[in-house]
Amino acid sequence: MKRPLDFLLAICLILLRSSTFADEHTVHWNSTNSMFRNRHPSIEVRLGDVVRFVCPDNEGRKNGEYLTVYEVSEFAMGECALESNSREVIKCGVDTNTEKIIRTHQLPIGESREPPKNVAQFIRSVNPIPNGKEYQPGQTYYYITTSSGKPGGIGQQMYGLCVSKNMRLSMKVLSSQPTPSPSSKPARSRTDARRQEDFITKSSAELMGGQEDEDSENDNAHLLPRDLEIATNPKFRRPSQFDQAAASAGVLDGQFLKVVQMAKEGKTGTFENDREVQKSAEKDAWDPINRHYVADLMNSAYKNANDRVVYQREPDFLIHEEDISTNSLGYSSSSSSSLPTFLIVFLIAVNLLF
């Protein structure tokens, strides 16, 4: 006996907790509700909320509305037609005597008017009641009524008020807690923004022929040590600093301007600059492209090499010109140079034998 009581107590606690922290959404299911005037009536609920479907209030009305609310699939809602697996949510028909008695006893003290019939749907992913309806976050559930609104058409299976009064509803279930909005891209720091401005400024200066703005001298003040090293590298210098880069590479200003002029004229190929002979021996030694100094070294190396040569291999083939007038060329192999001597010795030996 103790276990059933514990089970009922647990259910009561769950329901109490849900009702305490949940929101209640009331849907008045009648044709006069302005919600059904929208083309696609819809609501959003969260896990733990309560959705209450309220029947039309026919008290004191001569022509009341009598209908049944069903939970259907998306296709059935679009077609306004019931399927075999459609689930009845609430039936708003003529109350029987038993229903009238039950509802009368449920009235609060001091009230004599019966409230409209209603049913509450608890939005939860796990239902402690066996075979109870469970809702999953991210899913959408659909409700329609195909009744005609008359007492005799309460069991109609197609169209009805779903078509004539657009009495249909889409309910999307969200998670129990509001999902955080996708984090936007992190705001660029002041340094990144300044680097972007510098890049635009540099690109603009290059397009304008090397003209810089007034703040160009302070462009490197914000850079980190590693970025500063890259920024001061000659490969990344601005057009206005090319003269310094050329001087550091051993190229004179006149030569560099000549190259620039040839590039503007669209010339291609290789060329050699005319250099004046440097009179200072100290300056010649430090000139990285001193042609005369390199030529002297090469001549000295060749001269020393010729003095040390003591043997030179005889070429395998010799090409010579025998008749200049006929321009006929012939060749002789070094391996056949001893052939006539061998023939003479052979003929002398034959004569001695015979």
From Swiss-Prot:
InterPro entries: Cupredoxin, Ephrin, Ephrin_RBD. PANTHER family: EPHRIN, EPHRIN-4. Regulates the formation or stabilization of cell-cell contacts at several stages of epithelial morphogenesis. In early embryonic development, involved in ventral closure of the epidermis. During male tail morphogenesis, regulates precursor cell sorting together with mab-20 and allows the formation of distinct sensory rays. Probably acts as a ligand for lad-2 to regulate axon guidance of several neurons including SDQL, SDQR, SMD and PLN neurons during neurogenesis. Its main location: membrane. Residues 175-186 have a biased composition (Low complexity). Belongs to the ephrin family. GO terms for molecular function: ephrin receptor binding. Residues 336-354 form a propeptide. It comes from Caenorhabditis briggsae. The lineage of its organism: Eukaryota, Metazoa, Ecdysozoa, Nematoda, Chromadorea. Gene3D superfamilies: Cupredoxins - blue copper proteins. Glycans are attached at N30. This is Ephrin-4. In contrast to other ephrins, does not seem to signal through the vab-1 receptor.
